[in-house]
Amino acid sequence: MDNIVDSLNKAYEKFVLASAGVLESKESAGGQKALLTDTALENFKEKWELFRVACDQAEEFVESVKQRIGSECLVDEATGLTTTAAGGQAPAAVTGAATSLPPISAVRLEQMSRAVRWLVLELQRGSGVAPGSVHSSSTGFDSRFSEDSTQ
């Protein structure tokens, strides 16, 4: 993370120096178009692009950290490993109380996550129907689910 911050800081400093260079070259040229001003503008454009790249990299890093924290929180919540802010330990009554669902193992959570990802990919490809599923379009329900067959 320090490398990303340092890279962003250096790119910003170079960008600011390049913008100052443009202003100084315009002032020394008396507002007239000059080779020195054109060179300063090219340098400014280059530093601007490098600064944007550094910003994009920092944004990607922040997003990946947010996703990792979210995943860790999801696993902690699902497996019952949550803690309270005060005291650092959650009583058994508090763990899982928010959802009133029993905790599941991290392995089971990962299996379910993979299954959901697979289904999303299948839906994106347009198939939408898992192999072996029996779906009757004329009746409007999926016979795999007993609650649908009572309709």
Swiss-Prot record:
Q: Which residues cross the membrane?
A: none
Q: Work out whether the entry's keyword set contains Cytoplasm.
A: no
Which portions of the sequence form the region Disordered?
Answer: 128-151
Q: Which GO terms describe its molecular function?
A: transcription coregulator activity
**Which GO terms of the cellular component aspect does the record hold?**
mediator complex
Q: Does the keyword Lipid biosynthesis apply?
A: no
Keywords in alphabetical order? Nucleus, Transcription, Transcription regulation
Domain of life per record? Eukaryota
- Compartments where located: Nucleus
Record-level GO BP terms:
abscisic acid-activated signaling pathway; cold acclimation; leaf senescence; positive regulation of transcription by RNA polymerase II; response to hydrogen peroxide; root development
In terms of InterPro entries, this protein maps to:
MED32
Function per UniProt: Component of the Mediator complex, a coactivator involved in the regulated transcription of nearly all RNA polymerase II-dependent genes. Mediator functions as a bridge to convey information from gene-specific regulatory proteins to the basal RNA polymerase II transcription machinery. The Mediator complex, having a compact conformation in its free form, is recruited to promoters by direct interactions with regulatory proteins and serves for the assembly of a functional pre-initiation complex with RNA polymerase II and the general transcription factors.
Regarding protein family, the annotation reads: Belongs to the mediator complex subunit 32 family.
Record's subunit section: Oligomers. Component of the Mediator complex. Interacts with MED6. Interacts with GEBPL.
For this entry, the protein name equals Mediator of RNA polymerase II transcription subunit 32
Kindly list the organism's lineage.
Eukaryota, Viridiplantae, Streptophyta, Embryophyta, Tracheophyta
